[in-house]
């Protein structure tokens, strides 16, 4: 089998909220989609403690995309991992995470997301969308910062 083609984006910022506030905001997918414009309609979120699954539609450059199912694992409250369980063509998988580390200035948040394609479709999507993902993930983290700091208690 050929090696997959992976396209990633990463963003980081400091948010003046607790790690718990940050990660619980991400897990409230209906709210988080205000920061992550790649999330379309949320079909469901099932959570059992620190694990669960979410199914949501996608959006690429504002255009609707088929739904994906992601499993998640929360390591309270330092890390949140997402893994693709059922992905629409041409995706073969997805891996993403958020890490949170407390600092004197606030919570240092790092978000990385990687879309996994086949070799040929990946090359095409890198040309078409790779630039956008590299810009969108850092912008997503900044949108999250603005939303969370505006709603601070």
Residue ranges, per PLM feature:
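Residue-level detection of beta-strand scaffold positions
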Residues: 14-16, 82-84, 111-113, 134, ...
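Hydrophobic residues on conserved beta-strands that form the core of alpha/beta folds
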Residues: 10, 109-110
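Hydrophobic-ligand binding "helix-grip"
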Residues: 4, 33-37, 43-44, 48, ...
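Short, charged, surface-exposed hinge/linker loops at domain edges
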Residues: 53-54
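Residues that form or flank phosphate/diphosphate-binding pockets in enzymes
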Residues: 17, 91-92, 119-120
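A conserved amphipathic terminal alpha-helix motif
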Residues: 116-153
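Hydrophobic ligand-binding cavity/cleft-lining segments
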Residues: 1-50
């Amino acid at each position: 089998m050929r090696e997959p083609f992976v396209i990633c984006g990463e963003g980081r910022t400091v948010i003046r909220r607790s790690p718990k506030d940050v990660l619980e905001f991400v897990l409230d997918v209906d709210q988080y989609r205000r920061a992550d414009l790649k999330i379309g309609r949320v079909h469901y979120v099932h959570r059992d403690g620190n694990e669960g699954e979410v199914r949501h539609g996608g959006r690429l450059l504002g255009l609707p995309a088929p739904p994906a199912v992601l499993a998640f694992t929360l390591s309270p409250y330092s890390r949140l991992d997402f893994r693709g369980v059922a992905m629409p063509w041409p995706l073969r998988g997805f891996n993403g995470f958020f890490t949170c580390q407390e600092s004197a200035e606030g919570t240092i948040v790092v978000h990385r997301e990687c879309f996994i394609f086949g070799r040929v479709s990946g090359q095409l999507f890198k040309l078409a969308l790779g630039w956008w993902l590299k810009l969108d993930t850092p912008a997503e983290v900044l949108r999250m910062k603005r939303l969370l700091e505006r709603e601070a208690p």
